[in-house]
Amino acid sequence: MITLEVDLGERSYPIHIGSGLLDNAELLRPHVRGQHAVIVTNETVGPLYAARVEQALAALGKTVRTVTLPDGEAFKHWETLNRIFDALLQAGADRKTTLVALGGGVVGDMTGFAAACYMRGVPFIQMPTTLLAQVDSSVGGKTGINHPLGKNMIGAFHQPNAVIADIDTLRTLPPRELAAGMAEVIKHGAIADADYFAWIERNIQALNACDPELMAVAVQRSCEIKAGVVAQDEREGGLRAILNFGHTFGHAIEAGMGYGAWLHGEAVGCGMVMAADLSHRLGFIDIETLARVRTLTQAAMLPVVAPELGADRYIELMKVDKKAEAGSIKFILLKKLGEAFITSVPDADLRATLAHAVLKPPTEAPVA
């Protein structure tokens, strides 16, 4: 087992990465201080892993309740969130009750938001079971739900007590979900570590096959990068924005196609190619670097061609992005491989990237 730390002073917390961690009651013991625990999972993950976590908590003498949500980005909204609140209230949960997010990014985001809101804040633990959640969304305290007009527009910063990433859970991921997680792995190399990016290039076929040793390396390095950024800028006042590389375009794809048509990681993968194209058009990266981003994204079984929503529709959706200021869209671009920055861009260059990126006619599922 590898243990990292997100250094936030009194609110610092560990990230445990390894095999067989779902059953490890001793990892949970320091972080479940009250008598009651509520596991939040979904219809896919629950039957696979919930009983193991229930048993670990019961071994600590805790009273355990499990809430099972529908699976998918399409359910990341108020109605589903209220299921968590209903369960907490019906169980008589108090301020010492610990929530446990057992699932992917949607479960983690909603459980964290419920923890931030219930009684104005209760503790929670992230137990991510997808690659995307293990390398990205479980770390950093961003929580929230979607709104029909924008992704993750309603939420809060609420740090977990711990992140427990059992890489054994990656073995049960469908290939499409594994690929979606690889988008965030590639992102971390692109924005912060050119050597890591090159390592991913060399090992992409084995990573696609979910080689356990290489996957453990990827989860560790991605968590190191994200934890380092979050420690410097917890609430995204500056540096943390670079973690949104590919997300401005990606969120527009998700909203424009309808939440769930594209997985979040698929939209981010395509968005990274679009952001790299824009970086090249503005003279920051050369054509070879653009080609490397596109080639690696495609090799990870991710889409590199965007749906045709129309340039005006893309721009309308991107103006709702949280990074936008006074209607000005902000993009995370590459200065070079391994270094990113935030900027606004000329409208003509943005429209050129959008025109170059799309495939006609629109597709219901992403095209690699």
Swiss-Prot record:
Gene Ontology CC: one annotated term? cytoplasm
**Which pathway does it take part in?**
Metabolic intermediate biosynthesis; chorismate biosynthesis; chorismate from D-erythrose 4-phosphate and phosphoenolpyruvate: step 2/7
Which amino acid positions bind NAD(+), per UniProt?
A: 71-76, 105-109, 129-130, 142, 151, 169-172
Instruction: Provide the gene name from the record.
Output: aroB
Q: Does the keyword Metal-binding apply?
A: yes
Record's subcellular location? Cytoplasm
Cofactor(s) listed in the protein's UniProt record: Co(2+); Zn(2+); NAD(+)
Which protein are we looking at? 3-dehydroquinate synthase
Q: What does this protein do?
A: Catalyzes the conversion of 3-deoxy-D-arabino-heptulosonate 7-phosphate (DAHP) to dehydroquinate (DHQ).
Which organism was this protein described from?
Answer: Cupriavidus taiwanensis (strain DSM 17343 / BCRC 17206 / CCUG 44338 / CIP 107171 / LMG 19424 / R1)
Highest taxon, organism lineage = Bacteria
Among NCBIfam families, the record links this protein to:
aroB (TIGR01357)
- What GO molecular function terms would the record report? 3-dehydroquinate synthase activity; metal ion binding; nucleotide binding
* Catalyses which reaction(s): 7-phospho-2-dehydro-3-deoxy-D-arabino-heptonate = 3-dehydroquinate + phosphate
The UniProt keyword set, sorted, is: Amino-acid biosynthesis, Aromatic amino acid biosynthesis, Cobalt, Cytoplasm, Lyase, Metal-binding, NAD, Nucleotide-binding, Zinc
Q: A Pfam family for this UniProt protein? A: DHQS_C
Under Enzyme Commission nomenclature, its number is: 4.2.3.4
GO biological process: one example: chorismate biosynthetic process
